[in-house]
C-alpha cells in the first residue's frame, strides 16, 4: 500500500494496454499463489528461501520505531536494537513478512514472555493506535511513516548504526517468467 502511489499512475499512463490486477496479500498467500500459477509476480520482503521462486532485489527499507510519549525511550533521539524488548513490541499477525523481519532482529534480546496480553494485528494503523493507548511500541517500514500525521511523526525514532532494514524484492516463479 505504501509503494503503489509512488509509481502506479505513471505506470498506467505509460502502459495503458497492460492488464494490472493488484492485491494486498500476506507472504504465505503470495508464495502459495506464485507456486500454483495464480499470480505472475509480487513485491515482498525477502529472502524467502523458496526454491521455486526467483527474487530480484529492488531496495532496502529501514525500520523505524514508533515510540509513544509515555514510553521510556520517547526522549531518545535515536534508539538501538538493544533498547527493544520484543515483549513490548506490537506485531503484525503471522504470515506477514514484516513480522518475521522484526522477530529475526529482536530474537537475541528477547527478555521474558509477555504475560498480561498478546496482540497481533493485520494493519500498521491498528498497531499505531494501540501504541498510542499505552499498550507497547511498534516498528514500521520507513515508507509507511511518510503518510503519518505530524503528531505521530513526532513519535518516530530512527535507529543508530547498524540500522535494521528489510530487503524488498520483485518475486516470481522460476519455472515461467511471465513478466
What spans do the regions from the language model cover?
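A ligand-binding cleft/hinge motif common to bilobed small-molecule-binding domains
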Residues: 28, 46-53, 100, 104, ...
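Short beta-strand-to-loop elements that line the ligand-binding cleft
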Residues: 18-26, 45-46, 113-123
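Short secondary-structure boundary segments
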Residues: 46-47, 69, 95, 141-144, ...
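Secondary-structure junction motif
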Residues: 88-110, 179
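Flexible hinge/capping segments at coil-to-helix
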Residues: 52-89, 174
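N-terminal winged-helix
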Residues: 1-15, 19-24, 28-32, 100-101, ...
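A late-sequence structural motif
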Residues: 3, 155-179
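Short beta-strand-centered segments that line the small-molecule binding cleft or hinge
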Residues: 6-10, 21, 27-63, 67, ...
Amino acid at each position: 500500500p505504501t509503494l503503489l502511489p509512488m509509481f502506479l499512475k505513471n505506470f498506467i499512463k505509460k502502459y495503458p494496454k497492460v492488464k494490472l490486477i493488484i492485491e494486498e496479500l500476506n507472504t504465505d498467500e503470495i508464495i502459495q499463489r506464485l507456486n500454483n500459477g495464480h499470480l505472475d509476480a509480487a513485491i515482498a520482503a525477502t529472502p524467502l528461501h523458496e526454491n521455486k521462486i526467483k527474487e530480484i532485489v529492488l531496495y532496502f527499507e529501514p525500520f523505524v520505531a514508533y515510540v509513544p510519549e509515555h514510553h521510556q525511550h520517547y526522549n531518545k533521539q535515536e534508539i538501538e536494537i538493544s533498547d527493544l524488548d520484543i515483549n513490548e513490541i506490537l506485531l503484525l499477525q503471522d504470515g506477514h513478512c514484516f513480522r518475521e523481519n522484526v522477530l529475526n532482529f529482536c530474537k537475541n534480546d528477547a527478555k521474558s514472555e509477555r504475560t498480561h496480553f498478546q496482540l497481533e494485528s493485520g494493519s500498521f494503523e491498528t498497531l499505531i493506535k494501540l501504541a498510542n493507548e499505552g499498550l507497547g511500541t511498534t516498528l514500521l517500514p520507513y515508507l509507511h511513516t511518510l503518510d503519518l500525521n505530524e503528531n505521530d511523526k513526532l513519535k518516530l525514532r530512527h535507529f543508530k548504526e547498524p540500522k535494521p532494514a528489510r530487503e524488498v524484492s520483485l518475486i516470481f516463479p522460476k519455472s515461467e517468467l511471465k513478466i
